[in-house]
């Protein structure tokens, strides 16, 4: 396992973000340490899960607040140590192997080292036999595995995954989860979003619960699933959040005092 990285932690302090006229992230503060493992972000649709990942990776800049990586705020510096896989990954219109090689261009590797890392990542993703196949000819699940293998090949300290198994069948989901678990075991910090609570239970060491752009709870997974402290999180786990909303506990504006 890789030794603890010196560049983490990643910290967000009072971060807010607007999309048009809507605040999608609201005064959010959280911290991701350099401890290898998997932090899973959950919450209902529109909670801001994907946008939080984009903020972490520097794909979007906050309107307010501060995001620091080991005390620095340069998104380019974060990009040297992070990798992100979008829910709909962007792949080159080239072979599987060419996609992998492209991801490693920024690394100072000898041709032998590069080829070894490519072969290793493809083998772990179950894609070795497709090395010369155009990426566009892969199935949706295979493309997702390629995107994940490509991100992991650069050996990131922080790997950000947005719904990595969305719309995949159980077999493909199982392969994706194996890759995630192995990346964590190899020393990467994983931060991912999911709508699948069972998947969160299987993978998470830590859970973050978002609701309407606000972080309601961040806790060890065992503690969270044993019983969240936050009322909205409790309702979410019971599948009762829609009913909870209809009770009109909070007002519709940004100043509502939800639990």
What are these regions (language model features)?
Residues 57:
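Helix-to-loop junction immediately C-terminal to a conserved catalytic motif
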Residues 134-138, 142:
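Conserved ABC ATPase signature
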Residues 159-162:
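Catalytic Walker B motif of ABC-type/P-loop ATPase nucleotide-binding domains
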Residues 170-172:
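Helix N-cap at the start of a conserved alpha-helix in ABC-type nucleotide-binding domains
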Residues 194-195:
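H-loop/switch region of ABC-family ATPase nucleotide-binding domains
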Residues 200-202:
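A short, surface-exposed alpha-helical micro-motif characterized by mixed small hydrophobic
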């Amino acid at each position: 396992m890789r030794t603890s990285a010196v560049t983490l932690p990643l910290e967000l302090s009072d971060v807010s973000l607007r999309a048009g006229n809507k605040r999608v992230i609201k005064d959010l503060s959280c911290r991701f340490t350099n401890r290898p493992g998997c932090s899973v972000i959950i919450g209902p649709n529109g909670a801001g899960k994907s946008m939080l990942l984009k903020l972490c990776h520097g794909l979007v800049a906050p309107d307010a607040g501060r995001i620091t990586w080991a005390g620095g705020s340069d998104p380019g510096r974060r990009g040297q140590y992070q990798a992100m896989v979008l829910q709909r990954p962007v792949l080159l219109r080239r072979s599987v192997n060419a996609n992998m090689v492209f991801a490693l261009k920024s690394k100072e590797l000898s041709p032998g080292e590069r080829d070894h890392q490519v072969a290793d990542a493809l083998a772990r993703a179950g894609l070795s036999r497709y090395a010369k196949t155009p990426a566009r000819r892969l199935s949706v699940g295979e493309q997702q595995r390629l995107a994940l293998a490509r991100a992991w090949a650069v050996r990131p300290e922080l790997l950000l995954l947005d719904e990595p198994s969305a719309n995949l069948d159980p077999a493909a989901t199982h392969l994706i989860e194996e890759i995630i678990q192995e990346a964590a075991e190899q020393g990467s910090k994983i931060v991912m979003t999911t709508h699948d609570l069972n998947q969160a239970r299987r993978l998470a060491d830590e859970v973050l619960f978002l609701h309407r752009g606000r972080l309601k709870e961040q806790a060890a997974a065992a503690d969270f699933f044993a019983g969240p402290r936050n009322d909205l999180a409790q309702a979410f786990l019971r599948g009762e959040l829609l009913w909870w909303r209809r009770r009109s506990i909070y007002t519709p504006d940004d100043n509502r005092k939800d639990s």
